[in-house]
Every structure is written in structure tokens, then in C-alpha cells.
Design a protein with these regions (language model features):
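ADP-ribosyltransferase catalytic core
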Residues: 44-124
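Glycine-rich, aromatic-bearing surface loops/beta-hairpins
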Residues: 155-233, 251-273
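ADP-ribose/NAD+-binding catalytic cleft of ART/PARP-like enzymes
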Residues: 1-48
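Residues that flank catalytic or metal-binding motifs in active/ligand-binding sites
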Residues: 17, 78, 142
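A structural signal for short, well-ordered beta-strand segments and their strand-loop junctions
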Residues: 20, 81-83, 145-147
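Long, low-complexity, intrinsically disordered segments enriched in glycines and aromatic residues
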Residues: 87-187
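Short helix/loop capping segments that flank catalytic or ligand/cofactor-binding pockets
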Residues: 29-32, 63-65, 92, 156-157
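Intrinsic disorder/low-complexity signal
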Residues: 1, 232-252
Length: 273
């Protein structure tokens, strides 16, 4: 990703929608896809708008988090692509708070409806060690992870916000199979069957909120432990159970980075998986 900005939202998108991913259990995913809405699993009592959830536009990051849908747990058995209204997505993101400082991070994360974490981007890599599940982290490019809670999670019930819900599990599994056979070209064709992830052009005020216009630290300063983003649906009670994983920028600073109030709690579930 030479000459790629340090922080950039890359997604399958057009003027009308932006695609993000999340992995779910079979029962939640099946009901959501069939109804094209999370109202069905909510009504069945298996999905809750009270639980914080993390979405991401990077397919490879999603593959890493869910182990290509086959290498982790049953709660991440199926991968869904959520096509969100672009206009409403950008409006929602204006209320975001940064998990790791920055201008917007000066507000508290404790009550923020949207929390943004910038983690090292990941790319497909067939020689990766087992825990990296056919991916590896990049030190010079960041990928956005978007945590939703409260009113932002409730927006997932709105059909004017979530335009389409598509089960893309088989795309992920086929990509993993091709990648394991060292056919990265075929793996990419499978993973991005519906189109490539492209940089999103965003208005300056939103870029400022998301802390996008920052320079990458010198290469020597980003060789620390790669951060682990927040995982699948998790309540804030569960999130407070374990210790947070610092970003590589925090490691470079000696691992003593002070997160905005409430943010450390939200990121503690990162080490559970």
C-alpha cells in the first residue's frame, strides 16, 4: 500500500451506500438475512440493541477477526455485509469519539454513541503463523474499526439506514481456501467478488472528527505489538472484564498512552479473542 495515507477509510461504496462487515452466530445471521433486518433476531430475543457492536469496512480485517468464519468460535460463524446509507453513515460518524486520543477524543467515550479505533491494516498472507489466520498487519497504514452503542446500534433496525444485509460467508471461505493454496489472486477475486474497496472521499469536518489527517510515525516507532481491535457484539459489562491492548503508536510511546475517559473500558474486550 505504498503512498497510502496513514489513516483512510477504504470500503466498497458508491454515492448511495457504504459496506461494512460483522460476524454473527448462525441463528442471528440467518434471521437477519431472511428478513433483511435485525428486527427479526431482536424479536426472537437473540440480538439486542443494548449491546455494543463493532463494524468494519475492511474485509481482510473481518477475516482476521472471525478466522475466515471457520477458525474461531460459533459466535462468528457467518459473515454479513451491511450496506449502509452513505449519507446517514457520514452523519452518524460526525458524533464519533476517538478511542486513542486526538481532537475528538478529548470528549469522553463512556457515553459516545460511536467510538473509532484506528488499527494496523491487515493484508492476506498465506505464510502467516496460525494465530494470524492467513493475514498479517501493516505498520504504515491504519484501518478503521467502528464501535456502535445505544442510539447508533438502534439505527441498525432502521431500513433506511441498513439498506441490504447479505451473507458473504462463502466468499470468505473460498478466499481462505485459495489463499491457503498460495493463490492470492483467486483469493482476492473471491473476497471482493462484489467490487473493490476504494478510498472514501469525506468532507473536511468529518476527517477532523475521525483524526484522519495525521502523519504516520517514523517506521522505527511502529514496530511494537500490533493492536487487536474490539471484536464481535459485546456489552459494556463484558468489555470491562479484561485489559486493553495498546495500539502500536502507544507501544512506541512506551505503552503508557492515556486514553480518553471511558475508552479503555470499551477496548478491554479486545484481548478476549
Amino acid at each position: 500500500m505504498q503512498n497510502t495515507p496513514f489513516r483512510q477509510i477504504r470500503a466498497l461504496h458508491d454515492d448511495e451506500f457504504v459496506r461494512v462487515y460483522q460476524a454473527y452466530s448462525d441463528d442471528i445471521a440467518d434471521k437477519a438475512v431472511q428478513a433483511n433486518s435485525f428486527e427479526a433476531p431482536r424479536a426472537a430475543g437473540i440480538w439486542s440493541a443494548e449491546r455494543m457492536t463493532w463494524i468494519k469496512p475492511s474485509a481482510v480485517w473481518m477475516a482476521y477477526r472471525c478466522g475466515w468464519s471457520t477458525m474461531k468460535d460459533k459466535k462468528q460463524a457467518l459473515v454479513l455485509a451491511l450496506d449502509l446509507s452513505r449519507a446517514r453513515f457520514q452523519e452518524m460518524m460526525m458524533g464519533a469519539r476517538l478511542a486513542h486520543g486526538g481532537e475528538s477524543g478529548k470528549g469522553t467515550c463512556k457515553d459516545a454513541p460511536v467510538v473509532v479505533q484506528w488499527d494496523p491494516e491487515r493484508e492476506m498472507f498465506h505464510e502467516a503463523e496460525a494465530k494470524q489466520v492467513l493475514t498479517r498487519g501493516l505498520t504504515d497504514v491504519r484501518s478503521i474499526q467502528i464501535g456502535l452503542r445505544g442510539p447508533s446500534v438502534a439505527m441498525l433496525l432502521d431500513p433506511t439506514f441498513v439498506l441490504r444485509i447479505t451473507d458473504v460467508t462463502e466468499d470468505f471461505r473460498e478466499a481462505a481456501s485459495k489463499l491457503a493454496a498460495n493463490d492470492k489472486t483467486a483469493a482476492a477475486a473471491a473476497l471482493w467478488r462484489h467490487g473493490a474497496e476504494r478510498p472514501m472521499e469525506l468532507p473536511a469536518p468529518l476527517r477532523a472528527v475521525l483524526g484522519m489527517d495525521v502523519e504516520a510515525p517514523p517506521a522505527a516507532e511502529v514496530t511494537g505489538r500490533v493492536a487487536v481491535a474490539a471484536d464481535a457484539d459485546v456489552s459494556t459489562t463484558e468489555a470491562s472484564a479484561t485489559a486493553a491492548a495498546p495500539t502500536s503508536e502507544a507501544v512506541a510511546a512506551g505503552g503508557k498512552q492515556q486514553l480518553p475517559a471511558g475508552c479503555a473500558t470499551l477496548l478491554r474486550e479486545a484481548k478476549q479473542n
